[in-house]
Structure formats: structure tokens, C-alpha cells
């Protein structure tokens, strides 16, 4: 049977260690066995402490995120793509280190409204970045979950057909 989960933002803004720990405690106390955290920057949070608390409370962790324009792996700019690949690598490692099993969200482009269609080069850059990240995630025991979103959140994957074609 699948576990029922809840996003940490229901309980807290997710900006502090104490807030995330409180979200874990409240989730467990109300019967949830899975919590979704927004992107965890390793330099900001004590991932070992969060992992221990989650384990003690028997709550699984999933992490979701969207890339900023400065780290858009669907960009035509190699430096921006590289920044995105580095951010995704860091995110996979953070999910692994916190004992999580899933990294999801808008991992394939920036989380923003675009005013142009994606370029062929940008799409290929995104596919290559996700393939590279998938290899790292597989080795780390982390599933990647690509969130297909509406056109106001990304220009690359807006339909199930586009998502299936992408993978």
C-alpha cells in the first residue's frame, strides 16, 4: 500500500532547520508517512539530523524543486546548462544524504513562464542533462520524477505526450 504524504509547506515555510523538523513532527503526529520538502541546500540544513529525525519518526522524504533561469538545463548557453547540471547533482546528493528516495519537479528546465518556444539545441541540452543526472541518481538509489507542468511554468514539457517523448 502506498504511503500518504504531505508537503512541508502545509506546516512551515521550510526556510529553517527548526521549521523542517517541526514539519516532520507534525506530519508524523497526524499520520503521514511521507513528507515532501522543497529543494534542500546542503549548506543551509543539517541533512544528517533531518535524516535521523525522519527515520526516528518513520517518515519517508521526497524532495521537489524547479531550476532557476541561471541554471536552466534547457538553455542554449553552455555555462547556464553546466550550472543546472551542478545544481541537479547537488540535489541528488542531498536527497541521498537525507535518506530520501525521490527527487522530483521541474528538473528539465527553469521553473518560469517562457515567452519563446524551446530550441532544438535547448531540448537536446535538457535531455543530456537529465540522462546524466539519471545515471547519478540511479547510483545513489534516488528516483527522478519529472513533473509535467502547464505553459506558465515551463515551455518544454506541457503534455503527457511531450513527457513520454522526452524520456
Question: Residue locations for each model-derived region?
Answer:
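Active-site acidic/histidine proton-transfer and metal-coordination neighborhood
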Residues: 78-167
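N-terminal pre-domain/capping segments
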Residues: 1-100, 120-121, 138, 153
Amino acid at each position: 500500500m502506498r504511503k500518504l504524504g504531505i508537503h512541508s509547506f502545509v506546516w512551515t515555510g521550510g526556510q529553517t532547520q527548526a521549521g523542517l523538523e517541526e514539519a516532520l513532527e507534525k506530519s508524523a503526529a497526524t499520520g503521514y508517512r511521507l513528507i515532501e520538502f522543497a529543494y534542500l541546500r546542503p549548506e543551509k540544513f543539517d541533512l544528517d539530523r533531518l535524516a535521523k529525525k525522519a527515520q526516528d519518526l518513520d517518515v519517508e522524504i521526497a524532495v521537489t524543486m524547479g531550476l532557476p533561469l541561471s541554471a536552466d538545463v534547457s538553455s542554449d548557453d553552455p555555462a547556464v546548462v553546466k550550472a543546472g547540471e551542478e545544481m541537479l547533482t547537488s540535489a541528488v546528493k542531498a536527497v541521498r544524504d537525507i535518506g530520501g528516495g525521490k527527487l522530483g519537479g521541474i528538473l528539465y528546465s527553469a521553473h518560469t513562464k517562457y515567452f519563446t518556444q524551446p530550441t532544438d539545441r535547448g531540448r537536446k541540452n535538457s535531455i543530456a542533462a537529465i540522462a546524466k543526472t539519471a545515471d547519478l541518481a540511479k547510483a545513489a538509489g534516488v528516483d527522478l520524477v519529472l513533473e509535467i507542468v502547464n505553459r506558465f511554468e515551463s515551455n518544454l514539457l506541457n503534455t503527457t505526450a511531450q513527457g513520454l517523448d522526452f524520456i
